[in-house]
Design a protein with these regions (language model features):
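Active-site-adjacent structural elements that line small-molecule/cofactor binding pockets in enzymes
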Residues: 1-208
Length: 208
């Protein structure tokens, strides 16, 4: 390590922890962000950007992407020089009952993320800022079992991709196919066959 900055330095590298040289070269560094300042930092300094799962298509298109574009222009990089990764919230299953269980799990995740003050800006973007405050009150009161009930179908649909396994791929591509370079998906409870078919749906799209 040999970094000496204005405010801090990284220079201690004991031999025990010093990595061997790699033929792969310098590893890429991706940064995750939600708010505008960190999004700009990620665009100007990193090799790629990791979208937070608590993101909607509208927030990504209208907030994150313009900031990423401006950040790349500031350091004279093209969009093709940069990678965007996203792990969207998915509710799917191989039966109606399984889909309903997945939906309730996703409601819980949205409620948990939504209770965080640092993510209020995403809800504010949709005019749902009061929801964050209500979720935060329940979290502080340790009434976490009640939080998911505040996530109505409109909020759910904005944050999550929902449907049978053969409906997920087309929805992901319609929402995010022209935005992201890499999709990380974690649909729980699918058989290997159903998961394989979902991945085939995504891989069938030719690269630009």
């Amino acid at each position: 390590l040999n970094f000496y900055g204005e405010y801090y330095q990284h220079s201690l590298m004991p031999k025990t922890f010093k990595p061997a040289d790699s033929e792969a070269g310098r590893p890429q560094i991706f940064l995750s962000a939600t708010g505008p300042l960190m999004t700009t930092v990620a665009a100007e300094t990193a090799d790629g950007f990791i979208m937070h799962p608590f993101s909607t298509e509208s927030y990504i298109r209208k907030v994150n992407l313009p900031l990423i574009t401006a950040g790349l222009e500031a350091v004279e990089l093209e969009r093709s020089d940069y990678a965007i990764d996203f792990s969207p919230l998915i509710a799917t299953g191989e039966s109606d009952e399984a889909i309903e269980r997945a939906i309730e799990q996703v409601r819980g995740r949205i409620a948990f993320y939504g209770s965080t003050p640092g993510y209020k800006m995403v809800l504010d973007h949709h005019g749902w800022g009061d929801l964050q405050e209500a979720l935060n009150r329940l979290m502080k009161a340790r009434r976490t079992d009640e939080m998911a009930s505040l996530i109505d179908d409109e909020v759910l649909a904005a944050f999550a991709v929902i449907g049978a396994p053969d409906e997920i791929g087309p929805q992901l591509l319609a929402r995010y196919g022209d935005i992201v370079d890499r999709l990380s998906i974690q649909p729980e409870g699918l058989s290997e066959t159903a998961l394989g078919d979902l991945l085939d749906d995504l891989k069938a799209v030719p690269e630009a």
